Amino acid sequence: MAFKKLLAVLTAALSLRAAQGAAVEKRATCSNGKVVPAASCCTWFNVLSDIQENLFNGGQCGAEAHESIRLVFHDAIAISPAMEPQASSVRGADGSIMIFDEIETNFHPNIGLDEIVRLQKPFVQKHGVTPGDFIAFAGAVALSNCPGAPQMNFFTGRAPATQPAPDGLVPEPFHSVDQIIDRVFDAGEFDELELVWMLSAHSVAAANDIDPNIQGLPFDSTPGIFDSQFFVETQLAGTGFTGGSNNQGEVSSPLPGEMRLQSDFLIARDARTACEWQSFVNNQSKLVSDFQFIFLALTQLGQDPDAMTDCSAVIPISKPAPNNTPGFSFFPPGMTMDDVEQACAETPFPTLSTLPGPATSVARIPPPPGA
């Protein structure tokens, strides 16, 4: 989405909040005493309690949270104005990946999402909410469970999808940078900088299906924290593979136990995106601000923001990220500036400290049940 469209989305959201704030009679007090912009938001507190206990294991930033965040992107990005009128009923963030899961979770880029869809479906049925709204809500709550994440926005009002999204709309890790930039521009006129913002989600992510023999390989050494360490470690020279070396979409990583996607490697080094990538290193405030912005835009792809209800008050506030160094980012033990493959020609790479101690392996994340 171009900046002017992103600004329009945010302006609409803020205008809606202002209108709701001015019309006091439209606000509601839920049974738990929380005041929300509309009575329809109250049901989401019940959903929140349920999924925190029974999906996210008491509010953890684990595999179920990671896959819920992934599901938001894979549902939303599957929209293509360029395919109109063939896909005229496909509305991006509409829950089609859950409604038509037997079709969409068999698409190659969606492999592995059938498990989180299976885990989420009973909550949709139990609470009587739409799949599109639930996917956005679960993703926002999942992020709130990860220390360092922004205060997430959540709007309701997504009608159920009436047809599955076409195949071929979700970027793959083996796609070229050109292909991925073109795909996100087609989906919502997102530019190359906003693509980098989206990939901030890989700060709290792991691969379950790139290597068929090993699941739960994190993309950075702090997969339970929403921080900029992902943007550091993707710029370090690769030294080996945790599993096999012939997996499509994987390149060598700098740390044992870590998975590096080919697409992340290339975007971190492409002239169009390298400086934006580097800009997140040691800059937690920018990371938080930009991701909050892009997450809202993704969850409203194909929707009319003016027709949606702001229920952001239901989303918990994340804990702050632990401050390992003054700026949050660091070099893993045994690594220094000499290991950086810097691609941004405009600004120097930030000065970072190296964590003390011997080099260690990144621990795997147990995948969701049934994965």
Curated annotation (Swiss-Prot):
Ca(2+) 1 binds at residues 75, 92, 94, 96. Residues 1-21 form the signal peptide. GO terms for molecular function: diarylpropane peroxidase activity; heme binding; metal ion binding. GO terms for biological process: cellular response to oxidative stress; hydrogen peroxide catabolic process; lignin catabolic process; response to reactive oxygen species. Its EC number is 1.11.1.14. Disulfide bonds join 30-42, 41-311, 61-146, 275-344. Ca(2+) 2 binds at residues 203, 220, 222, 225, 227. It comes from the Eukaryota. It catalyses: 1-(3,4-dimethoxyphenyl)-2-(2-methoxyphenoxy)propane-1,3-diol + H2O2 = 3,4-dimethoxybenzaldehyde + guaiacol + glycolaldehyde + H2O; 2 (3,4-dimethoxyphenyl)methanol + H2O2 = 2 (3,4-dimethoxyphenyl)methanol radical + 2 H2O. Residues 22-27 form a propeptide. The keyword Heme applies. PANTHER family: CATALASE-PEROXIDASE (PTHR31356:SF66), THYLAKOID LUMENAL 29 KDA PROTEIN, CHLOROPLASTIC-RELATED (PTHR31356). Depolymerization of lignin. Catalyzes the C(alpha)-C(beta) cleavage of the propyl side chains of lignin. This is Ligninase LG5. The gene is GLG5.
